[in-house]
């Protein structure tokens, strides 16, 4: 009976210790030097809602600390849902700045709050919208090159006919003097081929492609972005995690 009683006491003490360690209110784990991965395992019991109660400004500051030093650019998108989906993906994977080129507005509802936590730049001058929506908008190539220079960006075009992401080492982008910007084109027309040719001499210029194993003309641009950003994240030796 004494042995059984002692076993029960030991189990109770063990449960109390575990509760104290895992309870975010005790903050004991905050002072322990754990690797980011182990810290995430210990702290995953925390209530995410409590983090968001700290306010938008604080969350944006946290996002900046954990950005993975890459930008994303969308060119002349038509659909707000695609804008929002890619913005959310960019936020999740630690984007530095999200560039919207050639679109005067987007539906903030499709972003589900991600537009509050990342840097967003909208440029309405590079691509001129035409009165007739069936006509492909004109791109000012010189303004585009100037924009890349001013923002210190290396263009990584995501388009068919480029280097397969299967063979590409995303860690090469870490050695560039400029920030890498993944560029996604219009849902229907893709990226202007002449624009790509104009950027060939820009440092870090690349065209990356997602290999296709089935017979279809193209892949949805949001799905395309999710594949590219995930491949970049998982291959990046300098990636940061929360």
Q: Which residues make up each language-model segment?
A:
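Short, charged, surface-exposed secondary-structure boundary motifs
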Residues: 129-133, 167-168, 215-221
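Active-site/ligand-binding-proximal alpha/beta "capping" segment
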Residues: 157-213
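Structured adenosyl-cofactor binding patch, chiefly the S-adenosyl-L-methionine
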Residues: 35, 196-242
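Loop/turn elements at beta-strand to alpha-helix junctions within RNA-recognition modules
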Residues: 8-9, 79-80, 187
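Short, glycine/charged-enriched secondary-structure capping and boundary segments
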Residues: 86-88, 113-115, 170-173, 196-200, ...
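Short glycine-/acidic-enriched loop or helix-start segments at secondary-structure transitions
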Residues: 83-84, 109-110, 166-169, 192-195, ...
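RNA substrate-binding interface of SAM-dependent RNA methyltransferases
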Residues: 34-37, 42-162, 226
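Terminal signal-anchor or tail-anchor transmembrane helices
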Residues: 2-27
């Amino acid at each position: 009976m004494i042995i059984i009683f002692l076993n029960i006491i030991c189990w109770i003490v063990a449960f109390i210790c575990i509760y104290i360690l895992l309870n975010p209110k005790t903050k004991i784990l905050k002072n322990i030097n754990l690797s980011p991965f182990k810290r995430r395992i210990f702290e995953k019991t925390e209530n995410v809602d409590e983090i968001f109660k700290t306010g938008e400004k604080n969350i944006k500051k946290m996002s900046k600390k954990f950005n993975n030093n890459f930008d994303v650019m969308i060119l002349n998108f038509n659909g707000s849902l695609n804008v929002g989906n890619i913005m959310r993906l960019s936020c999740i994977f630690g984007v530095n700045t999200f560039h919207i080129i050639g679109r005067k507005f987007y539906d903030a509802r499709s972003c589900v709050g991600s537009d509050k936590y990342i840097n967003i730049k909208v440029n309405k001058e590079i691509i001129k919208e035409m009165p007739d929506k069936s006509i492909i908008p004109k791109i000012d190539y010189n303004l585009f090159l100037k924009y890349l220079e001013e923002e210190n960006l290396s263009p990584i075009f995501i388009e068919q006919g480029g280097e397969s992401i299967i063979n590409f080492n995303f860690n090469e982008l870490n050695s560039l003097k400029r920030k890498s910007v993944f560029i996604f084109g219009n849902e229907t027309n893709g990226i202007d081929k002449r624009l790509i040719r104009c950027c060939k001499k820009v440092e870090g210029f690349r065209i990356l492609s997602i290999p296709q194993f089935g017979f279809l003309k193209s892949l949805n641009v949001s799905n395309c972005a999710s594949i590219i950003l995930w491949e970049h994240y998982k291959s990046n030796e300098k990636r940061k995690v929360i």
